[in-house]
Amino acid sequence: MNNLERLRQENPLVVCYTNDVVKNFTANGLLSIGASPAMSEAPEEAKEFYKVAGALLINIGTMTKANEQDILEIGKIANQQGTPIVFDPVAVGASSYRKAFCQKFLSEVKVSVIKGNASEILTLVDATTTMKGTDGKTDLDVVEIAKRAHEELNTAIVLTGKDDVVVQGGKVVKLSNGSPLLAKITGAGCLLGGIVASFLFREENPTLQVLEEAVSIYNIAAEIAEKDQQVNGPGTFLPKLLDQMYNIDFNTYQQQVKRQEVE
């Protein structure tokens, strides 16, 4: 049984502490791929949820001072329960507040995967980096950024961009599927964090293969959706993306994946 079939058979619970802008889209995307989302944020119920969850997604997109302690607490509870965490440091380079919080969080909580764009990932290992909102750009080598973050933060890295770079266990793969329309709908990257979480199956040290499958299956679904004759922009693309996430099978992934192993 491949990982996509396993996901659809097991219907893993993915607990999402995510930002207010993307909750609905994230939940619908996870349902479409075959997971079971729970948008639970209360530390008071975390222990019970995490006992049965396949993974926890923590996305700081709309965090405030009021929920800092909640995020730290649920991260620590997940660690205690052996529940893997996917951490999405949204716009971490946009403010010193976000940088300081992410540094504190990563010093106190062990995460299994960090997902972000090149600027976000670089900011985690280089405090001098700045970015504009969530869409930071950098001219630096994305492979080197991902490798450096993997080594310094001791966790798997999913770096997103024109090409996605996944680093785990000292191995690097560059993935080249996707659609430019993903950048035209809010929450596409945030949903990817949830998709990665849905493939973890309570494994705190996921394999490179699992991570690249999660990323590429999502991006191939986006490619297929973009080509649909009824799609003429972001508004018609979004529902077709959900449809293709629901319909995609592992054979399609194997036939269409664009991957390159990198030294």
Swiss-Prot record:
<dbReference type="GO" id="GO:0009228">
    <property type="term" value="P:thiamine biosynthetic process"/>
</dbReference>
<feature type="binding site">
    <location>
        <position position="187"/>
    </location>
    <ligand>
        <name>substrate</name>
    </ligand>
</feature>
<dbReference type="GO" id="GO:0004417">
    <property type="term" value="F:hydroxyethylthiazole kinase activity"/>
</dbReference>
<keyword id="KW-0479">Metal-binding</keyword>
<dbReference type="GO" id="GO:0000287">
    <property type="term" value="F:magnesium ion binding"/>
</dbReference>
<dbReference type="InterPro" id="IPR000417">
    <property type="entry name" value="Hyethyz_kinase"/>
</dbReference>
<dbReference type="Pfam" id="PF02110">
    <property type="entry name" value="HK"/>
</dbReference>
<comment type="function">
    <text>Catalyzes the phosphorylation of the hydroxyl group of 4-methyl-5-beta-hydroxyethylthiazole (THZ).</text>
</comment>
<comment type="similarity">
    <text>Belongs to the Thz kinase family.</text>
</comment>
<feature type="binding site">
    <location>
        <position position="39"/>
    </location>
    <ligand>
        <name>substrate</name>
    </ligand>
</feature>
<keyword id="KW-0547">Nucleotide-binding</keyword>
<feature type="binding site">
    <location>
        <position position="160"/>
    </location>
    <ligand>
        <name>ATP</name>
    </ligand>
</feature>
<protein>
    <recommendedName>
        <fullName>Hydroxyethylthiazole kinase</fullName>
        <ecNumber>2.7.1.50</ecNumber>
    </recommendedName>
</protein>
<dbReference type="InterPro" id="IPR029056">
    <property type="entry name" value="Ribokinase-like"/>
</dbReference>
<keyword id="KW-0418">Kinase</keyword>
<dbReference type="GO" id="GO:0009229">
    <property type="term" value="P:thiamine diphosphate biosynthetic process"/>
</dbReference>
<keyword id="KW-0784">Thiamine biosynthesis</keyword>
<keyword id="KW-0460">Magnesium</keyword>
<comment type="pathway">
    <text>Cofactor biosynthesis; thiamine diphosphate biosynthesis; 4-methyl-5-(2-phosphoethyl)-thiazole from 5-(2-hydroxyethyl)-4-methylthiazole: step 1/1.</text>
</comment>
<feature type="binding site">
    <location>
        <position position="115"/>
    </location>
    <ligand>
        <name>ATP</name>
    </ligand>
</feature>
<keyword id="KW-0067">ATP-binding</keyword>
<dbReference type="GO" id="GO:0005524">
    <property type="term" value="F:ATP binding"/>
</dbReference>
<keyword id="KW-0808">Transferase</keyword>
